[in-house]
Structures are given as C-alpha cells and as structure tokens.
Regions:
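Short amphipathic alpha-helix
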Residues: 28-29
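Proline/glycine-enriched tight loop/beta-turn segments at coil->beta junctions
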Residues: 6-12
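Serine-dependent carboxylesterase/thioesterase catalytic core
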Residues: 13-19, 23-24, 33-34, 39-51, ...
Length: 121
C-alpha cells in the first residue's frame, strides 16, 4: 500500500492482476502513480495455474480489500485481463458495487474466451 492516509479526498485505488500474473505487472504503473493522493493496493491473488474458481478469487479480493481498508471504505477498482473478470465477479456477486466508486476494465475477456467454447471429448 502506498499514498496518502485513508482520509484522502480520493478513495484508495485497488489494482487486480490477471491470470498467470502477479501484482508486479503493475510495477511501471505504480511508478507513474507515486504522487497519487490515495493509497494503492495491488493484492496477490494466487490462481494455481487457473484452477482456482473465479468465485474464490473474488472472495480473496474482498478479504484483501477489507484487510487493507476495512469493510466500509469506498474504493476505485482497476482490473487487468482476468483481474477485471475477478473484479466484476466481486462487484456483482459479493456486494462490491456498494463500495466501488469507479470500475475500470482493461484488456479483459468479459464475454469469455475462444478456449471457453472448445468442447472436450
């Protein structure tokens, strides 16, 4: 976490990495946001090579946000790739929409992927 105190006029910014990524994917972005006037959180959400269920990752995201900022703090949320799908799942299924001011989805497969439509015999 970095940035100003929780009393900042801007809510904390939460960055959610994608599948086969870690919070390190946001390293350069965080360098550009060094003077950002609010805390920044980029939690690590282990996916176990893609076998961790999406709902579990969304619950892990909620735990990380609650641990960092408490359950009532409004946040801004940026999800990259599968991280945006995890974020959307948290917003829609776990009440994240009640505390999220803005949600930004970057490069995400919100409509699924080609691999998802392949049938296994």
């Amino acid at each position: 976490m970095q940035g100003a105190s929780l009393m900042s006029p801007k809510p904390p910014l939460v960055l959610v990495h994608g599948l086969w990524d870690t919070p390190n994917v946001f390293r350069r972005l965080r360098q550009h946001l060094e003077d950002w006037p609010a805390p920044i959180l980029a939690p690590h959400l282990p996916h176990k090579l893609g076998f961790t269920p999406l709902k579990t990752l969304a619950q892990d995201l909620e735990l990380a946000i609650d641990e960092a900022f408490g359950p009532d703090q409004t946040i801004d949320l940026l999800g990259f790739s599968m991280g945006a799908v995890i974020s959307r799942t948290w917003l829609q299924l776990y009440g994240g929409h009640r505390r999220t001011r803005r949600f930004v989805s970057l490069g995400s497969p919100q409509n699924g992927t080609l691999v998802h439509s392949i049938r296994y015999f």
